[in-house]
Amino acid sequence: MQRTPAMRVLVPALLVAISALSGCGKSEAPPPAQTPEVGIVTLEAQTVTLNTELPGRTNAFRIAEVRPQVNGIILKRLFKEGSDVKAGQQLYQIDPATYEADYQSAQANLASTQEQAQRYKLLVADQAVSKQQYADANAAYLQSKAAVEQARINLRYTKVLSPISGRIGRSAVTEGALVTNGQANAMATVQQLDPIYVDVTQPSTALLRLRRELASGQLERAGDNAAKVSLKLEDGSQYPLEGRLEFSEVSVDEGTGSVTIRAVFPNPNNELLPGMFVHAQLQEGVKQKAILAPQQGVTRDLKGQATALVVNAQNKVELRVIKADRVIGDKWLVTEGLNAGDKIITEGLQFVQPGVEVKTVPAKNVASAQKADAAPAKTDSKG
């Protein structure tokens, strides 16, 4: 068959088109997978001061209820409600008229019995009176002397004085009111606010754990600062003055399972008032060679266990189950599962899994592990 010029042009073109179509069916080889990059923090052992934050209430250092010790009508109130008073300062004046008369009568009776006792003393020497008569006269004199002292005390009690220095509250009585010795209601109450008590409660389990750690050497006592306490107010501000631990209760409350701890704080400006809700920060002790792990690198699995991903010497990811004791600042205090020198992953966690080889760079989302903020940890922040 003889090819025409048109066929000679068409055949090579078809061959080229078929070759091109067959080339389109072949897929290119995928590029090699890139090694994921993660941000890590290298852990270092450090000395950490452990604090516990506990809720509490303020209480007056001393409380004295002012009550009358004699009966009578109130003539004057001599203080301003809500003011500061001194011990021995007069607060009320009870009508003294009756007690002044009793005192004068007792003095007159004393003079009479004293004169008679002295006369009988001379007469008994001459046997003009019996020894019994002299003894009776001397006893009457002594009774009169005691009556004068009692009348003087009652007269003094018409001036109602403050038993302690402190701030006095509102007055429960006014001028013209009748008050009686031994009445149930106080006339006023004086509270000493400087210093002031702070009573906090700590679970007995936490107290037992603290004692065990101190006994085993896991914790060291914080020396001169062992009994120091700081205070956070209800609005979140820090109280500027430091207090000291006074005592802990000798028994555990059966209803709450807690122990009461009392601290005392200086309060020169009366900034703290009785009944305020506060948070006391108690220094437990010092932990040597503590491991602090950034919170960004600690997660929990389905069982609720704290876990962390670390990069081993072969640059591969390892899963560690750890024991996170408490939060200190923005880090977890880890007591098991991590060691000094471990490289904990804090960035890129979502791109890796155990066994994967990774490329490490210093993390940017956390501060240096060497600059741990040893802020107080609440007792409920343990993991």
From Swiss-Prot:
Residues 1-23 form the signal peptide. This is Multidrug resistance protein MexA. InterPro entries: CusB-like_dom_1, CusB_D23, MFP_Efflux, RND_pump_MFP. The keyword Coiled coil applies. It is found in: Cell inner membrane. Export of antibiotics and solvents is dramatically decreased in the presence of the protonophore carbonyl cyanide m-chlorophenylhydrazone (CCCP), therefore may be driven by a proton gradient. Antibiotic efflux is inhibited by pyridopyrimidine derivatives, such as ABI-PP, acting by binding to a hydrophobic pocket in MexB. A lipid is attached at residue 24 (S-diacylglycerol cysteine). GO terms for molecular function: efflux transmembrane transporter activity; identical protein binding. Keywords: Antibiotic resistance, Cell inner membrane, Cell membrane, Coiled coil, Lipoprotein, Membrane, Palmitate, Signal, Transport. It comes from Pseudomonas aeruginosa (strain ATCC 15692 / DSM 22644 / CIP 104116 / JCM 14847 / LMG 12228 / 1C / PRS 101 / PAO1). Component of the MexAB-OprM multidrug efflux complex, composed of six MexA subunits forming a hexameric tube, binding to a MexB trimer, which interact with the trimeric OprM outer membrane channel protein. OprM is thought to not directly contact MexB; instead, MexA joins MexB and OprM by forming a funnel-like hexamer anchored to the inner membrane. MexA may initially form a hexameric ring complex with MexB prior to OprM, then OprM undergoes a conformational change as it contacts MexA, allowing the periplasmic gate to open. In both X-ray crystal structures approximately the last 100 residues are not ordered. Changing residue 123 to D: Abolishes complex formation and thereby abolishes drug resistance. Residues 97-151 form a coiled coil. Its main location: membrane. The periplasmic linker component of the MexAB-OprM efflux system that confers multidrug resistance. Functions as the major efflux pump for n-hexane and p-xylene efflux. Has been shown in one study to be involved in the active efflux of the autoinducer N-(3-oxododecanoyl) homoserine lactone, thereby playing an indirect role in quorum-sensing; but has been shown in another study not to be involved in efflux of this autoinducer. Over-expression of the pump increases antibiotic and solvent efflux capacities. Implicated in the secretion of the siderophore pyoverdine. Belongs to the membrane fusion protein (MFP) (TC 8.A.1) family. It comes from the Bacteria. It is a lipid-anchor. GO terms for biological process: protein homooligomerization; response to antibiotic; transmembrane transport; xenobiotic detoxification by transmembrane export across the cell outer membrane. Changing residue 130 to D: Abolishes complex formation and thereby decreases drug resistance. Disruption phenotype: Disruption of MexA, MexB and OprM significantly reduces active efflux of N-(3-oxododecanoyl) homoserine lactone/3-oxo-C12-HSL/PAI-1, but not N-butyryl homoserine lactone/C4-HSL/PAI-2. GO terms for cellular component: efflux pump complex; plasma membrane. Induction: By growth under severe iron limitation. NCBIfam families: RND_adapt_MexA, RND_mfp. A lipid is attached at residue 24 (N-palmitoyl cysteine).
